[in-house]
Amino acid sequence: MAQKGIGVSNLPNVKYRSFCKAGIDFNIMTVGSNGLGKSSFINQMLGDSILSSDPFLKPEDGHHSNETVRALDEDIVDDPESKYFHRNSLINIQISKFFVMENDFQTRVTVTEVDGVGDGVCNEGCWDPIVELIQDNFRDYLDQERKNVRSLIKDKRIHICLYFLEPNPSHVSLVDIRTMKEISKICNLIPVVGKSDLLSDSEREECRNRIVEVLSMENIDVFRLDILEKEKISRTESPFFIIAKNVNSGDSSGHNREYPWGTMFPEKVESNDFYFLVDSLIAKNLIRLVETTEVFYDEYKTREIGLSIASKPGALGEDDRRLTKEIQKKIKEDERTIVELRQKLIEKRKYYESKMLEITSKYSNEKINSS
């Protein structure tokens, strides 16, 4: 009789079933000025018209509700907090929650839309509510961690922020630069250019170079997608250029984008990075986004615990307070060192990628000439 073992080899299947049953929380934030296609991006990503074309125009009250799609949890369907709308003089914020079920695997998706960034006459401090919202979610997670078993925690932390930039080949606004810089310190950030069909090929390249230059000069750290080797030649790093469709429920025409001069088919536009970006985020990098969010959360948690200890009267002696300040100073120095090293790695990576493109182009030309 052949030895069948004790069943250890079946543990991956048990883990898989457990993971499918528990599901995963995925929280995405879109940020930018009005009219750049943030809602259209989310609608096309989730495959249905779940968000209105402009959800910020007519909020009926403090809670602005949209119909949920694929909602399977009664708590979320009936809970008024599952739809939240906030408006102030600087920006508008809408939070919507959905359930997506695919092949018996459930994903709890929370979409946070931030609109109106840079649209005001005075935009000073418009990034503060965004930073506060991200940190409030960290604080909520920390409070739950103190009270509950970690597996029972509802994760509201933002896993990825897509920052929508205007399709302008010559300029990136100071408000966008400052907002991206503040967000990148506490959250995974990917800059994208909305409505990029307004740009010609040469303008698109100018826009890309300008944004890359700004990100480098301002030391804005962006999330680097894991890209397959065969895709690295044809795909570059962020910013990504997006053309989203007008998604309508029940529309069988392919959800194309209609213009006065005709119809455009986004899936046939070679320069449209939408499909590549969504596939990279969801299918290939979702778990890594959650893991890197843990790093941002641990940094926040360390600061909060340190401040809470230091603020208690009589909790620390003079030596302890001095030591705490030294540790905090060392952490800041280490963070600056990490940013500098990361920047050097980015520069080296760009250099080798340019060499790869040069060699590939040279090889292709030689092959053409020889034939």
UniProtKB/Swiss-Prot annotation:
Domain Septin-type G: 22-307
Record-level Gene Ontology MF annotations: GTP binding
Ranges for region G1 motif: 32-39
Keyword field contains NAD: no
Keywords tagged on the record: Cell cycle, Cell division, GTP-binding, Nucleotide-binding
GO terms (BP aspect): cell division
Residue numbers binding GTP: 32-39, 116, 195-203, 257
Region (G4 motif): 194-197
This protein's record includes keyword Transmembrane: no
Annotated segments matching region G3 motif: 113-116
GO cellular component, one term: septin cytoskeleton
Family matches, as InterPro entries: G_SEPTIN_dom (IPR030379), P-loop_NTPase (IPR027417), Septin (IPR016491)
Family the UniProt entry places it in: Belongs to the TRAFAC class TrmE-Era-EngA-EngB-Septin-like GTPase superfamily. Septin GTPase family.
Protein purpose: Septins are GTPases involved in cytokinesis. The septins localize to the site of cleavage and act as a structural scaffold that recruits different components involved in diverse processes at specific stages during the cell cycle. Septins are also involved in cell morphogenesis, chitin deposition, cell cycle regulation, cell compartmentalization and spore wall formation.
Oligomeric and partner information: Component of the septin complex.
Full protein name: Cell division control protein 3
Organism encoding this protein: Encephalitozoon cuniculi (strain GB-M1)
